[in-house]
Amino acid sequence: MAKIDLTEYLEKLKEPEDRETVANREYQQQLFLEYVVRGDNFPEQRATLLRDYHAGKELTGPKGLRRRLGAFDLEYFGRAYLAHYFVRRSPAFHGELDRIWREGVLKGKNPDTDAKEISRADGCRRAIEAPRGHAKSTTFTFKDDLHAALYAYKHYIIILSDSSEQAEGFLADIKTELEENAALREDFGELEGRVWKSSVILLANGGKIEA
């Protein structure tokens, strides 16, 4: 029986993970460079972020460029943190949904710096009608609720649906991301709070999401 070089074997085991790590880092870099110059809102902040990138500032982490750009660019937030849901550029309809959230909920402000002001602003009532399969719930109930909870500009989020089971299903998806999403955990830290149930969760940053 041929002998196995244990060191070589262990190195081979590491290779796929290393390749995946490198590929993810390259993806995040390319995505950032694409989106930081693509949007038309917050031009001064975008220019600052681009300068910071070329100056060698960290892309990821609690003070990273990814988190800072994701605060006011909702499409980038989806593709940077939830790439398994948002796999390509958003169509025009999704851009319209993002615009509704930016203007109606965020009030045109940057939640990374103005979270308290956003949270104290008047609410927004909008009715959105579109055929099934147009990702309305994925965009609003999933992505945007996560965005509001992570950047802490909404402290009590209620998920309403046709049934409690369906609402809890959306909350379960959000919980999964908070528990297992490496990018979210790297930039926003451990967010699991003292209540973590199928119908309600409390986040470590003080936020609450209830189905």
Model-derived features: where do they sit?
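Contiguous, well-ordered alpha-helical segments that form the cores/surfaces of helical PPI scaffolds
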Residues: 95-102, 138-150
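N-terminal accessory segments
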Residues: 1-123
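Generic structural signal for beta-strand residues in well-ordered domains
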Residues: 119-121, 150, 194
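Walker A/P-loop
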Residues: 120-145
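C-terminal PAP-associated
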Residues: 16, 138-139, 171
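Conserved nucleotide-state-sensing and coupling region of NTP-binding domains
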Residues: 160-210
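Post-Walker A helix-loop "phosphate-sensing" segment adjacent to the P-loop in P-loop NTPases
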Residues: 147-156, 179-182
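Short acidic, glycine/Ser/Thr-rich loop/turn "cap" segments at secondary-structure junctions
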Residues: 123-131, 152-162
